[in-house]
Curated annotation (Swiss-Prot):
Any one GO BP annotation for this protein: alpha-pinene metabolic process
Chief place of localization: plastid
Chemical reaction(s) catalysed: (2E)-geranyl diphosphate = (1R,5R)-alpha-pinene + diphosphate
Protein name: (+)-alpha pinene synthase 1, chloroplastic
GO terms for cellular component: chloroplast
Species: Pinus banksiana
């Protein structure tokens, strides 16, 4: 690892902006990072920070530190400040509202006898196609009632064999049944995967003709999409996924580059659990007009596409302003001075924007970006930079939850502590106005548990202790921080979350336990080698190997990944189970945050190394607009 030189913290008064724009002055910080002050028996200790990230030889006055050597922030602050917001003119909003009305009229035509969408031979597929299209184009929030009406109609004709293309279609149709299974299940309707049994031949196998037409390929593509919404024990869904994956990979070798091939490549790569809605919308806008296999009037496709582009760009202008606000917050709190840590606030905000595209959810997007960034800095303090003595002091300060606690902290910790204290309290107070109950104490308790898990891991690192797999996972589910990044932003969304519902989503619910376990395990499969190189031996992989002497590292990784796959199916069920009593829309927020982190760990540790995939995501969904 390369040496990282410490940069002095700003000695001026630190003007701190809270999440909602209020400001106040913090006490001046007069010491620099290499001259840290901390309380011990009334004496000030000033340890040096100049040491290797892999070895440390300290004398009486030096504290050994490990530094990870993370790369710097990739997004130039001046460039972010100069981003244009060219779609804020009222005329764009007026144009979008006009198109929304026209699309609503198209939905209304579905209830007209003998209308363009009501042929008894194709009406079911028409409805499913409309619902699927507005969802993938990112404009579904405007048509909630219309979507419910369309799906109620489809479900009224659903049978144990699935459906045909229309209510009088007769023969079960692969495309309509697969799309119906996926869409109805995602909207909370009770549909069995056994409908897919009726799409097999007499040998119990999925089959298709040797001639791979565009229509047939799209049929199998929807079968693949449906197979991903699997519950535990659904062998038919596993078989459908295996068959459709092989078929689509073979088709890619035969068809020319096109919108269809682009869509196949995208879905095979991202599936469902690493597929972020705005990211898919950006792809789907590019390929939407190329499907010529479905008998939808050209004018209808054009209206949907025009609305999707306008909505994407209007939201794009809002996203840029929010990102500029986040960048100012990052600078005002002095985060650029913390040179030993990762700075991924732009990436975190982008990920939030990819799952929450309602303009009203600004507090959620900014809150997620800020909390995730602060957690990342704390992670680097507890895992690498802080000494055990400093970490004990910081942990005690968080337990007291009192600004006066910072007097005994090293200077570099003071600013971080106050950033957390200010923003969490402010967000909790704003959430309390919405929820009508004490979210401040609720948030504080969740942070106490989170910090407690951090100090436990720090003790393991300091002592060289390698826990059992179960011991590690139980602590790791808390230390990952997904509960923190989910809970507080979710409480600002504007809909009530009474304790009765919250307890089904938050700790200690099974839903929360599954999301935390999935993310801890998935993250460890991508991080364990780099963590080990920094002296952080405990991981899901290494602890599993400890519990199973003789197993190879590769086999341990495969076992952990298999656990993730099984837990993911359990999470699907917890999200969509019809008997939970909690609306899917409430749980979907936490589920989508799980998808965010799943995406970040798809290729590597995307939160330590900002990969080309993450950079492309920021460019495609935040920096660039869609050509109209």
């Amino acid at each position: 690892m390369a040496l990282v030189s410490a940069v002095p913290l700003n000695s001026k008064l630190c003007l701190c902006r809270t999440l909602f724009g209020f400001s106040h002055e913090l006490k001046a910080i007069h010491s620099t990072v290499p001259n840290l002050g901390m309380c011990r028996g009334g004496k000030s200790i000033a340890p040096s920070m100049s040491m290797s990230s892999t070895t440390s030889v300290s004398n009486e006055d030096e504290a050994p530190r490990r530094i990870a050597g993370h790369h710097s922030n990739l997004w130039d602050d001046d460039s972010i400040a100069s981003l244009s917001t060219s779609y804020e003119a009222p005329s764009y909003r007026e144009g979008a509202d006009r198109l929304i009305g026209e699309v609503k009229n198209i939905f209304d035509l579905m209830s007209v006898e003998d209308g363009v969408f009501t042929s008894p031979l194709s009406d079911l597929h028409h409805r499913l196609w409309m619902v699927d299209s507005v969802e993938r184009l990112g404009i579904d929030r405007h048509f909630k009632d219309e979507i419910n009406s369309a799906l109620d109609h489809v479900y009224s004709y659903w049978t144990e064999k699935g459906i045909g293309r229309g209510r009088e279609g007769g023969v079960t149709d692969l495309n309509s049944t697969a799309l119906g299974l996926r869409t109805l299940r995602l909207h909370g309707y009770t549909v069995s995967s056994h409908v897919l049994d009726h799409l097999k031949n007499e040998k119990g196998q999925f089959t298709c003709s040797a001639i791979q037409t565009e229509g047939e390929i799209r049929d199998v593509l929807n079968l693949f999409r449906a197979s991903l919404i699997a519950f535990p024990g659904e062998k038919i869904m596993e078989a459908a996924e295996i068959f459709s994956t092989m078929y689509l990979k073979d088709a890619l070798q035969k068809i020319p580059p096109s919108g269809l091939s682009q869509e196949i490549e995208y879905l095979l790569e991202f599936g469902w659990h690493t597929n972020l809605p705005r990211m898919e919308t950006r792809m789907y806008i590019d390929v939407f007009g190329e499907d010529t296999t479905f008998e939808t009037p050209y004018l209808i496709r054009e209206k949907l596409l025009e609305l999707a582009k306008l909505e994407f760009n209007i939201f794009h202008s809002l996203v840029k302003r929010e990102l500029q606000s986040l960048s100012r917050w990052w600078k005002d709190y002095g985060f650029p001075e913390i040179t030993f840590s990762r700075h991924r606030h732009v990436e975190y905000y982008t990920l939030a924007a990819c799952i929450a595209n309602d303009p009203k959810h600004s507090a959620f997007r900014l809150g997620f970006g800020k909390i995730s960034h602060m957690i990342t800095i704390l992670d680097d303090i507890y895992d690498t930079f802080g000494t055990m003595e400093e970490l004990e002091l910081l942990t005690a300060a968080f337990k007291r939850w009192d600004p006066s606690s910072i007097e005994c902290l090293p200077d570099y910790m003071k600013g971080v502590y106050m950033a957390v204290y200010d923003n969490i309290n402010e967000m909790a107070r704003e959430a309390q106005k919405i929820q009508g109950w004490d979210t401040v104490s609720y948030a504080r308790k969740s942070w106490e548990a989170f910090i407690g898990a951090y100090i436990q891991e720090a003790k393991w690192i300091s002592s060289g202790y390698l826990p059992t797999f179960d011991e590690y996972l139980e602590n790791g589910k808390v230390s990952f921080g997904s509960r923190i990044t989910t809970l507080e932003p979710m409480l600002t969304l504007g809909f009530p979350l009474p304790p009765r519902i919250l307890q089904e989503i938050d700790f200690p619910s099974k839903f929360n336990d599954l999301t935390c376990a999935i993310l801890r395990l998935k993250g460890d499969t991508q991080c364990y080698k780099a963590d080990r190189a920094r002296g952080e031996e405990a991981s899901a992989v290494s602890c599993y190997m400890k519990d199973h002497p003789g197993i190879t590292e590769e086999d341990a990784v495969n076992q952990v990944n298999a656990m993730v796959d099984n837990l993911t199916k359990e999470l699907n069920w917890e999200l969509l189970r019809p008997d939970s009593g909690v609306p899917i829309s409430y749980k979907k927020v936490a589920f989508d945050i799980c998808r965010v982190f799943h995406y970040g760990y798809k290729y590597r540790d995307g939160f330590s190394v900002a990969s080309v995939e993450i950079k492309n995501l920021v460019t495609r969904t935040v920096v660039e607009t869609v050509p109209l």
